[in-house]
Amino acid sequence: MHCPFCGANDTKVIDSRLVAEGEQVRRRRECLACGERFTTFETAELVLPRLIKQDGSRQPFDEEKLRAGMQRALEKRPVSVERLEAALVHIKHKLRATGEREVKSLVVGELVMTELQKLDEVAYIRFASVYRRFQDLNEFREEIDRLAREPGKE
């Protein structure tokens, strides 16, 4: 680490603490050349993978686009903003956990479907009807029947 006072490369860490609810590390450092002390903050750079669209094109992950799609499905449904945000955090966590630099957009779509199914089944059906391009009532009926057959449903 360069000393901001004299530019020397030799510094030592005298104290480290977690701050910002564990999201940052605060370090007190001392320059071994001039003796000045200074503070640094470290945060992890958590980059989400790029998306590979069905046509093969690539684009950066867009959290706002994801949020808008989920909000559209959840419109006029009894789901709090907090639960929606928690679902978004869970999706982003799963994407980061892949360790991949690029993922197919289908992976994101399936993660959204999983989270919406947990939040609200009506929102799930709304999203699925667009995402899976339902063509007629039978496709809706089949998906609703599949939901009803899942374990834990009455």
UniProtKB/Swiss-Prot annotation:
GO terms for molecular function: ATP binding; DNA binding; zinc ion binding. It holds the Pfam family Zn_ribbon_NrdR. Keywords: ATP-binding, DNA-binding, Metal-binding, Nucleotide-binding, Repressor, Transcription, Transcription regulation, Zinc, Zinc-finger. Its cofactor is Zn(2+). Residues 49-139 form the ATP-cone domain. Binds 1 zinc ion. The keyword Transcription applies. InterPro entries: ATP-cone_dom, NrdR-like_N, RNR_NrdR-like. GO terms for biological process: negative regulation of DNA-templated transcription. Transmembrane segments: none annotated. The keyword Repressor applies. It comes from the Bacteria. A zinc finger (unnamed) spans 3-34. Negatively regulates transcription of bacterial ribonucleotide reductase nrd genes and operons by binding to NrdR-boxes. Belongs to the NrdR family. This is Transcriptional repressor NrdR. It comes from Pseudomonas syringae pv. syringae (strain B728a).
